From Swiss-Prot:
Induction: By stress conditions e.g. heat shock. It comes from Oceanobacillus iheyensis (strain DSM 14371 / CIP 107618 / JCM 11309 / KCTC 3954 / HTE831). Keywords: ATP-binding, Chaperone, Nucleotide-binding, Phosphoprotein, Stress response. This is Chaperone protein DnaK. Residues 524-560, 572-612 are annotated as: Disordered.
């Protein structure tokens, strides 16, 4: 049975983990790093993912970053005449993660637990599941990031009853969850968050400040220059990280742009105090969901035993200070904020596989679910923070006489009016027998599975006719689209592999041409001109094949040249052997001649007494 890997598919970075010997371990990427940038780039038809893609982002406009912010929307990005959905871009990242996880584990990986922000709605969860499918992964479970973090943190503390608050500030999303841990049960009590707030926003306030200051000095708006913007983004991210450890940092961007007088440079000192001032609104925005999570759980800050930080942005000192002030305690530093979510996902994979025993995870739905009823209001069937999986049903009736069909408008959100909430889907129940309004009995049932994905059913209790829908938002992908993307992803994987093989073959051919020249030079007059000529012409044929780009020809000509070079080397070896034998023969003769000069002598023993 293949292992289930745990993937934290992040906005800025992603991480993958697997259970090994009863413990979750992080799988390093090919560069040896424990997290990989969630960046995809396209260059001359080739796809680049992770570190490589991020490194060349400044010079390559065909680079996609922070795609997670667009999951579950109809956003598309156009690269080299082709449009990509967020699901496809995420699938490219997942394919990359899957490939290096397979190299590490040593076997094919087909199943995964993928984490999402707790505040992801149904469309965003479905999009994540689709991305996994396109990448060739069966997504066994979608779990909330704060829940995964609590699982990784609390797995060795099962005997202690604790109420913990998980503060998760990632690259593009923010969540707070409160969990009760005890006797191996992890129960989410409440969750709150903001899907449009994260580390990227902290970078942006630094970028805006740099643009503003530069404009003041030079009357040039750097935000209109694409390459300058990418350099500013990298500098802002670095400054943000530096200011977590030092109180001020130098930002230096030479040749950022050119003015009438020539090239211009950006030089600036950024203090931690200035950064705190610029980002104070963002920090305060994280406090509102924190208070909401506490009030939803009917808890006060004194009821919280531990505060766990998740996400790289929680390293910002102002964030830690705000948490300490709000909750009256220092957050726990016992877990790595970049890795803890992936570790928790791997533990959940272990639970599903049966490797981790006596652990029960009770998650909640982050938003209320209901339908639109008369007067365009939302009637809730499942309240937010309800433990999942769950189901609920309610009976409704018709709004007009002789109404033969009802439209079921499925909604997710906390607002009273239907138009203010998120539409998850619509479907129709038809063939209702004509009757006065209020007479027909229509039962509407909601089911939420463990992944947080919703099924809705409407049934006419009079005729037992029913209609159901698995919610896929208007921005979601149809099964046909997912299948097409799966096929494309597989083809791309094959194409990438073929491209890699071509590069390897070209490198081997170039190396062989170099070796041939060296061998011919070393042999000099030790082999016949005819043999040398054969090798030279085989080498020229290989060069021509390389220029033509026909890989079949390159392979054939490479094999032919290898044969010639081996023959030349063999002749050289024979010659060296002959010379060695000849030399040892001459040495033998010489020593024989030396023996002829030896004088035989008789020895007689001399007695000491005779000498006297």
């Amino acid at each position: 049975m293949s292992k289930i890997i745990g993937i934290d598919l992040g906005t800025t970075n992603s991480c993958v983990s697997v259970m090994e010997g009863g413990e979750a371990v992080v799988i390093p990427n090919p560069e040896g790093n424990r997290t990989s940038p969630s960046v995809v780039a396209f260059k001359n038809g080739e796809r680049q993912v992770g570190e490589v893609a991020k490194r060349q982002a400044i010079t390559n406009p065909n680079t996609i970053q922070s795609i997670k912010r667009h999951m579950g929307t109809d956003y598309k990005v156009k690269i080299e005449e082709k449009e990509y959905t967020p699901q496809e871009v995420s699938a490219i990242i997942l394919q990359y993660i899957k490939s290096y996880a397979e190299d590490y584990i040593g076997e094919k990986v087909e199943k995964a637990v993928i984490t999402v922000p707790a505040y992801f709605n149904d469309a965003e969860r479905q999009a994540t599941k689709d991305a996994g499918k396109i990448a060739g992964l069966e997504v066994e479970r979608i779990i909330n990031e704060p829940t995964a973090a609590a699982l990784a943190y609390g797995i060795d503390k099962e005997d202690q009853d604790q109420t913990i608050l998980v503060y998760d500030l990632g690259g593009g999303t923010f969540d707070v969850s409160i969990l009760d841990i005890g006797d191996g049960t992890f129960e989410v009590v409440s969750t709150a968050g903001d899907n449009r707030l994260g580390g990227d926003d902290f970078d942006q306030v630094i970028i805006d400040h740099m643009v503003q200051e530069f404009k003041k000095e030079n009357a040039i708006d750097l935000s209109q220059d694409k390459m300058a913007t990418q350099r500013l983004k990298d500098a802002a991210e670095k400054a943000k990280k530096d200011l977590s450890g030092v109180t001020q940092t130098q930002i230096s961007l030479p040749f950022i742009t050119a003015g009438d007088a020539g090239p211009l440079h950006l030089e600036m000192t950024m203090s931690r105090a200035k950064f705190d001032e610029l980002s104070s609104d963002l920090v305060e925005r994280t406090m509102q969901p924190t208070r909401k999570a506490l009030s939803d759980a009917s808890l006060s800050k004194s009821d919280i035993d531990k505060v766990i930080l998740v996400g790289g942005s929680t390293r910002i000192p102002a964030v830690q200070e705000a948490i300490k002030k709000e909750l009256g305690q220092d957050p726990s530093k016992g877990v790595n904020p970049d890795e803890v979510v992936a570790l928790g996902a791997a533990i959940q994979g272990g639970v599903l596989q049966g490797d981790v025993k006596d652990v029960l995870l009770l998650d909640v739905t982050p938003l209320s679910l209901g339908i639109e009823t008369m007067g365009a209001v939302t009637t809730k069937l499942i309240e937010r923070n309800t433990t999942i999986p769950t189901s609920a049903s309610q009976t409704f009736s018709t709004a007009a006489d002789n109404q033969t069909a009802v439209d079921i408008h499925v909604l997710q959100g906390e607002r009273e009016m239907a138009s203010d909430n998120k539409t998850l889907g619509r479907f129709q129940l038809t063939d209702i027998p004509p009757a006065p309004r209020g007479m027909p009995q229509i039962e509407v049932s909601f089911d939420i599975d463990a992944n947080g994905i919703v099924n809705v059913r409407a049934k006419d209790l009079g005729t037992n006719k029913e209609q159901s829908i698995t919610i896929k938002s208007s921005s979601g992908l149809s099964d046909d689209e997912v299948d097409r993307m799966v096929k494309e992803a597989e083809e791309n994987a094959d194409a990438d592999k073929q491209r890699r093989e071509e590069v390897d073959l070209r490198n081997e051919a170039d190396q062989l041409i170099f070796t041939t020249d060296k061998t011919i030079k070393d042999l000099d007059d030790k082999v016949s001109e005819e043999d040398k000529q054969k090798a030279e012409s085989a080498k020229d044929e290989l060069k021509q094949a390389l220029e033509s780009g026909d890989m079949e020809q390159v392979k054939a000509k490479k094999d032919a040249l290898e044969e010639h070079v081996q023959q030349l080397s063999a002749k050289l070896y024979e010659q060296v052997q002959q010379e060695a034998q000849q030399a040892s023969g001459e040495q033998g003769e010489e020593s024989g001649n030396q023996d002829d000069d030896v004088v035989d002598a008789d020895y007689s023993e001399v007695d000491d007494d005779d000498k006297k």
